[in-house]
Amino acid sequence: MTVLVKHLGVVDYVSTYEVMRAFTKERNSTTPDEIWILEHPPVFTLGLAGDAGNLHSPSNQIPLVQVDRGGEITYHGPGQIVVYLLLDLKRLGIFVKELVSRIEQALINTLADFGLVAERRSGAPGIYVSLQPGISPEWIGAKVAALGLKVSKSCSYHGLALNVATDLEAFGRIHPCGYEGLKTVDMQTLGIKDNIDTISQRLLEHLQKQLMPT
């Protein structure tokens, strides 16, 4: 079945969240899957396992939104590629654990296309910078991409976020994913100058290869 890809630009978090929840609630076995690629204005989101105390330095300029995805607290903002994956997992024949693994591999492959080596970390979904030449030691082990999913009626929503040229100061206000001291980095800080549209397209290609192999 064809997957509908939507490039939404910069869109409000809460309204987008409400639309994807409604889409998932109303879809049926014949509803085409959708992939939404977008950016959000600055917002902190707190997942089902979240502790609001992990927002240790609140900002009057950045709202905190409680959401129904898995995981802890994270930040979304301009310069970060957000991809929402509205997929019928039963139809694709993918279980949640396999979905996470495939998303992570798509992110690893995307970063590799731009000369960056990255890796998974057991027990901590997301993608982290690996030891490699040309990267400052302070960024080894830093988180460059995050995942957070919700599955309802065998259908996924929410998705992933890849930091391209993001406000890293905002991440300094939280314990990302609940881990105190975890550093967050973006591709620009790691020396990648390609624009966000180029990186978004490459990420989309890798997601399609991983999730909808021909």
UniProtKB/Swiss-Prot annotation:
Name of encoding gene: lipB
Major site of localization recorded for this protein: cytoplasm
An annotated GO BP: protein modification process
Subcellular location: Cytoplasm
Note: In the reaction, the free carboxyl group of octanoic acid is attached via an amide linkage to the epsilon-amino group of a specific lysine residue of lipoyl domains of lipoate-dependent enzymes.
Keyword Transcription among record annotations: no
Keywords: Acyltransferase, Cytoplasm, Transferase
Positions bound to substrate: 69-76, 146-148, 159-161
Domain BPL/LPL catalytic: 29-214
Protein name stated in the entry: Octanoyltransferase
Active-site residues, as the UniProt record annotates them: 177
Site (described: Lowers pKa of active site Cys): 143
Family, as annotated: Belongs to the LipB family.
Enzyme class at the top of the EC tree: transferase
Entry annotated with the keyword Transmembrane helix: no
Enzyme Commission designation: 2.3.1.181
Signal peptide: none
Function: Catalyzes the transfer of endogenously produced octanoic acid from octanoyl-acyl-carrier-protein onto the lipoyl domains of lipoate-dependent enzymes. Lipoyl-ACP can also act as a substrate although octanoyl-ACP is likely to be the physiological substrate.
Gene Ontology MF annotations: lipoyl(octanoyl) transferase activity
Species of provenance: Polynucleobacter asymbioticus (strain DSM 18221 / CIP 109841 / QLW-P1DMWA-1)
InterPro entries associated with the record: aa-tRNA-synth_II/BPL/LPL, BPL_LPL_catalytic, Octanoyltransferase, Octanoyltransferase_CS
GO cellular component term, pick one: cytoplasm
PANTHER family: LIPOYLTRANSFERASE 2, MITOCHONDRIAL-RELATED, OCTANOYLTRANSFERASE
Highest taxon of source: Bacteria
Catalytic activity: octanoyl-[ACP] + L-lysyl-[protein] = N(6)-octanoyl-L-lysyl-[protein] + holo-[ACP] + H(+)
